[in-house]
């Protein structure tokens, strides 16, 4: 898929702007705080209906404006289609081909993106919450079923936590309702866990050879899914559900005393091992960076396999930080296949082959100067 045009109205520091996009590489150059990252963020937000930089949509609206609008025309192998996102201080509205979508699960997946920013090192060295969000953002783009299962799980988790808190405070005494909630909780916990396990397995298969290539076969990467609910995946669905219910039943008193759910996908994690050692704890910054890049490049290939279209790659101020070896592997992945948007303060240090296939835009105070 390609983004042909991007139109912004009242988005961050942009008043009105239209970007006609190059099908290969688009380089956004400018000093800091001019709007480069805002433009990249708008593409991400158009794809996922949420920003990667803030959870408050109101921050996306230009100062003193009543709304923000993002619109993009996409081309696929079989035609073109517009996507629109309209943000007000009361909420947001999304449209596919001019038709409003009542649920975000119906919207997400029409535009797939992979973002690589300096903070993506936190996928390796940050908290489990960051890694769970990474799984949800990437898997959610390629599986509407996963998005729905995750939304149902989060709804039931909230209900269960509210009831556990009432039990802890003595406001409720009946455990029957907790047993009912646990039954629903177990069903969706199993679905989310199953899909995450499969996703990590597929991602590892693609990331391993990429990582080996970047390191000239000196390092071996492995991904390990660490689910909070541990059960035998080889069992049939009924047996797995029974095993989860047994875990929840055995820990019902503990959860009641703590007033919170102690087990479930909301406590999952992933570990990244390099040559058998945990990269988070023992990896150098170079190893952590290579691991993060390998994961991102694997995402690109996995999305193409799953949906039949390459995603759009967003590189936020990272390209010039990659050494020649990493840039070479990045180039071999994206060249003439993946439409890419790059932000940078200088083109120095960017591979000349990337520059030869690129269109340069200068960004100055929320305006695009070609």
Swiss-Prot record:
GO cellular component: cytoplasm
Segments passing through the bilayer: none
Superkingdom classification of source: Bacteria
GO biological process, one term: DNA replication
GO MF annotation: an example: single-stranded DNA binding
Pfam families: SMC_N
Keywords per UniProt: ATP-binding, Cytoplasm, DNA damage, DNA repair, DNA replication, DNA-binding, Nucleotide-binding, SOS response
Coarse class of the protein's main subcellular location: cytoplasm
Binding site residues for ATP: 30-37
InterPro entries xref list: DNA-binding_RecF, DNA-binding_RecF_CS, P-loop_NTPase, RecF/RecN/SMC_N, RecF_2
Subcellular location: Cytoplasm
General function of this protein: The RecF protein is involved in DNA metabolism; it is required for DNA replication and normal SOS inducibility. RecF binds preferentially to single-stranded, linear DNA. It also seems to bind ATP.
Protein family: Belongs to the RecF family.
PANTHER family, A to Z: DNA REPLICATION AND REPAIR PROTEIN RECF
HAMAP family (UniProt xref): RecF (MF_00365)
Protein name as it appears in the record: DNA replication and repair protein RecF
């Amino acid at each position: 898929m390609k983004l042909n045009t991007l139109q912004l109205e009242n988005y961050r520091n942009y008043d009105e702007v239209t970007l006609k996009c190059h099908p290969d590489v688009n380089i956004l150059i400018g000093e800091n705080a001019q709007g480069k990252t805002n433009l990249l963020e708008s593409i991400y937000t158009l794809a996922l209906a949420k920003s990667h930089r803030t959870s408050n949509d109101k921050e996306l609206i230009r100062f003193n404006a009543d709304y923000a609008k993002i619109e993009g025309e996409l081309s696929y192998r079989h035609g073109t289609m517009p996507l629109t996102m309209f943000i007000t201080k009361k909420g947001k509205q999304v449209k596919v081909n001019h038709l409003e979508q009542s649920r975000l699960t119906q919207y997400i997946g029409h535009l797939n993106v992979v973002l690589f920013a300096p903070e993506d090192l936190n996928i390796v060295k940050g908290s489990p919450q960051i890694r769970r969000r990474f799984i949800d953002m990437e898997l959610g783009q390629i599986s509407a079923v996963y998005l729905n299962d995750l939304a149902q799980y989060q709804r039931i988790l909230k209900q269960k936590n509210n009831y556990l808190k009432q039990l802890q405070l003595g406001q409720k005494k009946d455990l029957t309702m907790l047993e009912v909630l646990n039954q629903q909780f177990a069903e969706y916990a199993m679905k989310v866990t199953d899909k995450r396990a499969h996703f990590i397995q597929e991602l590892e298969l693609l990331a391993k050879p990429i990582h080996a290539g970047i390191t000239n076969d000196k390092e071996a990467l492995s991904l390990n899914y660490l689910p909070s609910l541990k059960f035998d995946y080889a069992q049939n669905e009924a047996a797995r559900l029974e095993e989860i219910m047994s875990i929840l039943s055995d820990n019902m008193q503990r959860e009641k005393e703590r007033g919170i759910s102690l087990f479930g996908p909301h406590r999952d994690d992933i570990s990244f091992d390099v040559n058998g050692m945990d990269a988070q704890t023992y990896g150098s910054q170079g190893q952590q960076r290579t691991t993060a890049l390998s994961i991102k490049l694997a995402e690109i290939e996995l999305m193409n396999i799953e949906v039949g279209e390459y995603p759009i790659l967003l590189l936020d101020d990272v390209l010039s930080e990659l050494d020649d070896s990493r840039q070479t592997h990045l180039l071999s992945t994206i060249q003439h296949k993946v439409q890419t948007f790059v932000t940078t303060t200088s083109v120095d240090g960017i591979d000349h082959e990337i520059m030869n296939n690129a269109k340069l835009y200068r960004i100055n105070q929320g305006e695009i100067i070609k």
